[in-house]
Amino acid sequence: MQKKYFFVTLLIFCLSFPSFVTGQDIPVIVIAPSKKPQSISTVGTSISILDENFFKNSKEIFLGDVLSRNSTSTNFFQSGGHGTSSAIQLRGMPKRYSTVYIDGVKMSDPSSVSGDFDFNNILTSQISKVEILKGNQSSIYGSGAIGGTIHIFTKQGKPGFHKDIEYVAGSHNTHNLSASLSGGNKKSNYYLGFQRFQTDGISQMTHNDEKDRYRNNGLIASYSRKFTDKIELQSNARVAETYLQYDAACVSNLFGCSPNYDHAEETDGLEGSYNISLIHKPLEKFSNKFTLANTYIKRIYASAPNSKNTKQDNYYGDRYAFLYQGNYNFNLDNSIVFGLEREDDQMGYNKDATVRINSSSHVISQYFDYQSRITNNIYATFGARFDEHSFAG
């Protein structure tokens, strides 16, 4: 195994700027910049925040549609209609340099060529907040975060008991149903949500009534419990099952392609993630967080007769991550975050009709991030990270 260390330093000085506040002057708290709660006025990097009320007012069903219209320095790409491949660029960097996290779980796809995450299956009814960090975040999140990071937080339970159901219908047999149950008290909270979206879509073929169907069944769940003032358990889970039809491209033969060629390719997808965290706070100024996380992505492509794709492709990517994070607050103006991480990836695909390719790799990382208020108007951040990859070094 190669042993080569990747080192990143980041030093930022910034003038303080007003917090985004409500009528009661409550400061906005963010988590993504340093992996711990802090006021947005102390963040030394460009950040955009989309909260739950924003998503309710937007009326968009897919997260990608929201981000494409409401975030600067963000480029959203989609290859077609609902369910087709999509990705996001931050600060003009290639999409593989913009990492995505859902409830703290890294969501890149080990089975894809560049490892970037596909946004096409994330529905807005499941989201409470999105934090978009723009610019290099490598000292905290690794070399894949040169362009920035997108942090998606799903809904959590609130005190009391709550239930919600919403149904919307439209043309082309389009239906969207979402429902949830949630609740909580002083020691624990829970949330369970389901959403189903389906549509016949709009086909580019004009000579028949062939459909480009898409279906998305999504389920999220969360549970947290505070056992004592020093020990807390947090957990999140997410599953998305999808089905997509799209127009097949006919391969020309001696007689050419029939003008009435109306076959469709099909893609079945399964995407899941979960994380379980134990938080231990032995001191008022010091806390530890231990996390086990997993993501699983599977895609099956079924070819149409006489199409350019001549076989059925089956891709899967599986990642386990073991994470430790420590936080120490020296005082109100100085704090440090440090951690150890190990990610184990497995992937597989069909090279041809008879050969199956499987591969695995791992990366071990150590990092720290120190934040300090120099004066009332200037903040400084210094961070370093070491990555050891089993293949790349």
Where are these regions (language model features)?
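Extracellular loop and loop/strand-boundary signature of outer-membrane beta-barrel proteins
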Residues: 114, 162-166, 204-209, 252, ...
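N-terminal periplasmic accessory domains that precede
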Residues: 29-31, 63-70, 86-89, 101, ...
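Hydrophobic, lipid-facing positions within transmembrane beta-strands of outer-membrane proteins
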Residues: 86, 148, 161, 175-179, ...
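Surface-exposed extracellular loop regions of Gram-negative outer-membrane beta-barrel proteins
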Residues: 187-201, 287-304, 335-343, 357-393
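Transmembrane beta-barrel wall of Gram-negative outer-membrane proteins
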Residues: 169-198, 207-245, 266-283, 330, ...
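N-terminal periplasmic "start-of-domain" segments of outer-membrane beta-barrel proteins
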Residues: 28-58, 87
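Short acidic/polar hinge/loop motifs at secondary-structure boundaries
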Residues: 106-134
